[in-house]
Amino acid sequence: MTGSKSVRNLTQGKIFSQILFFAIPVIIGNLLQELYNVVDTLIVGQTLGEIKLAAVGSTSSLNFFALGFFIGLSAGCSVITSQHFGAGNIKQIKKSVAAHILIGVISSAVLTVAFVFLVNPFLTMLGTTKETFDYASRYLTIIYLGIPATMLYNLTASLLRSVGDSKTPLYLLLFSSVLNVGLDLLFIVVFKWDVAGAAIATVVSQLISAVLCCIYICFKVKLLLPTKESFTSIGRMVADELKVGCPMGLQNSVISIGMMVLQYFVNQFGSYAVAGYTIGNRVQMLVQNPMNSISMVIATFAGQNEGAGKYDRIRKGVNYCLILCITYAIAVGALTMLFATPITGIFTSNSSQQTIDYSVQFIFWNCPFEFTLGMLFIYRGTIQGLKNGIIPMIGSLIEVLMRICAPVILSSIIGYISICVAGPAAWTASMLLMLAVYYIKMKGFKNKKALA
């Protein structure tokens, strides 16, 4: 049925080994994707200075507001593909791909135009400092113009993962990441394109990765190639994909709203705080990326196994993923805290002690709570894999509320620390909701099995 050795059926075989071997390429691939942003931060910080580093960093929440939507939308739409793959229905697999393409093309075209025109109003709304505004505007405009490239990569990569192929996106992303480093150095250091060079390098690298993914699917995974017939009478399929994909996409965008509010409060502490927060946030995102990757794995795993009616296998898979995430969070969190100061120093040359202090403080308040975030990722990913996008979106609204409340209530009392504790508070509140919903769903499956 698959047409490719790289395709993996997650409804059969030993659960732990299936999850582990599927997860490793996803983890490495997502780390490489995160390195796009980290490399920009490193090179901008080392070559252009702290002001331009703060400019690039101040756009991160706005960047994720748009790009996070497509990441969630693609992952959600691919849940439907994974369920049809688990059920072995080739015709429906192709229809789901056709619907995914239609949704991706229309949404990326509309949002690219809208967001490019909203760059400056967005930055003004966030209270971006005068010395960083022009640089931030230039960088973000180019990133938004690259939305179609981001959409195309996430569409193709998520489709490959939906049929159990996590290696191919990794190989292509590895090539693209190396290219990104080279283009960063070429555009910033040689061509002197300033922060615009960093943005162009990121967009070009992701576009190349997306094109290579498309070529691979055309020649190696023809199961994912829709026919002309696949595009007919797909209204129901589009609706099914939007039912899962939109809440997942909006979930990311809603979370980014909380990040924007947080960025507004960070901006009030000045450019050194913005630079320190940027570095600390980049470090934390690298730490969190493997756990987020396992969340993507469990979503695919749950989707395929629900399609096959193997509910007990879902429960066991979740337990294995929880063990992986919690163990990782404790170990890596401790190491990150231990080496927080030297890690911070890597990002800028001649960085001020103020910037280092802000960054280290952020890391020290976040790392002890990473295990909570890991649990949130696993429970949320499972619920999304079971075609429920509404509950995770409600969880995202809770996260936003907590991210807003922390600085609003505490900034006048504990200052910058209110920024640091906003994330852990948001993770904990949302995780408790996901935990409750997960166990309710598992109980429902148990009753369903008993009745059968």
Feature map (PLM): residue ranges:
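Short alpha-helical transmembrane segments in multi-pass integral membrane proteins
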Residues: 1-23, 81-146, 190-246, 302-369, ...
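Residue-level signal for short hydrophobic patches within transmembrane helices
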Residues: 12, 16-35, 39, 62, ...
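Transmembrane helical elements of multi-pass membrane transporters/channels
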Residues: 21-40, 142, 153, 176, ...
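Transmembrane alpha-helix boundary and packing residues in multipass membrane permease domains
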Residues: 26, 30, 42, 79, ...
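Helix-terminus/linker motif at the lipid-water interface of multi-pass membrane proteins
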Residues: 35-54, 123-130, 186-193, 253-286, ...
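Small-residue-rich hydrophobic transmembrane alpha-helices
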Residues: 53-113, 150-169, 276-340, 373-395
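Hydrophobic transmembrane alpha-helices of multi-pass small-molecule transporters
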Residues: 65, 180-185, 210-214, 286-289, ...
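Short runs within selected transmembrane alpha-helices of multi-pass transporters and secretion channels
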Residues: 74, 143-161, 169-177, 198-213, ...
